[in-house]
């Protein structure tokens, strides 16, 4: 993640090319960013809203299990539950969905890197928990439809 949103200029100049923002923008929560989540989150939300103005950009909702996000689950003696993961990740997933809409968002597992935080099952269950109030159409977009369209795949 970068506060200058430099990629948006490129996306505006090449509107026929689909830009993919991975890992919700790769927000850092360690090293120099540790303990500054609230400050960084507000700046990141502003940048996400700006990037979402580029109609050719989609965002992958995942990769949040990497240690660089700074949730600290990897430091515990026991793994987090799906509910704990959902609660932690929600602060990044929901603003992306609000800014981009479900037709420009797709859940991603990012395994094995996300394995640093939680298991594969907990990851996908966390996404289901986050999306529990979405309509069936919205869930289809988030879990398969957007990815199928962007990557030109045949969705079930």
Residue map of PLM features:
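N-terminal cationic-hydrophobic initiation segments that often serve targeting/anchoring roles
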Residues: 9-13, 52, 97-98, 131
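Mid-to-C-terminal alpha-helical segments outside catalytic/metal-binding sites
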Residues: 91-95, 99-106, 113-156
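Generic detector of well-ordered alpha-helical packing
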Residues: 5, 24, 109-111
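Active-site-adjacent C-terminal substructures of enzyme catalytic domains
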Residues: 35-117
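Non-cysteine beta-strand/loop elements that form the S-adenosyl-L-methionine
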Residues: 19-25, 57-61
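Short, catalytically relevant binding-site loops at active-site mouths
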Residues: 6, 25-29, 65-68
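Beta/alpha (TIM)-barrel catalytic core signal, keyed to glycine-rich beta->alpha loops juxtaposed to Asp/Glu
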Residues: 21-39
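Short, small-residue-biased leader/transition segments that mark boundaries at the very start
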Residues: 1-7
């Amino acid at each position: 993640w970068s506060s200058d949103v430099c990629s948006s200029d490129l996306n505006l100049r090449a509107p026929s090319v689909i830009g993919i923002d991975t890992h919700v923008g790769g927000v850092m929560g360690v090293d120099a960013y540790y303990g500054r989540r609230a400050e960084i989150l507000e700046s990141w939300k502003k940048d996400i809203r700006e990037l979402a103005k580029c109609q050719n950009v989609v965002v992958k909702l995942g990769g949040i299990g990497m240690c660089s996000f700074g949730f600290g689950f990897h430091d515990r003696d026991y793994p987090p539950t799906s509910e704990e993961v959902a609660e932690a990740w929600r602060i990044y997933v929901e603003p992306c969905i609000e800014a981009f809409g479900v037709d420009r968002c797709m859940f991603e597992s990012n395994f094995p890197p996300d394995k640093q935080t939680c298991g594969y099952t907990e990851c996908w269950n966390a996404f289901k928990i986050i999306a529990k109030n979405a309509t069936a159409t919205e869930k289809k977009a988030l879990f398969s439809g957007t990815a199928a369209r962007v990557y030109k795949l045949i969705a079930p």
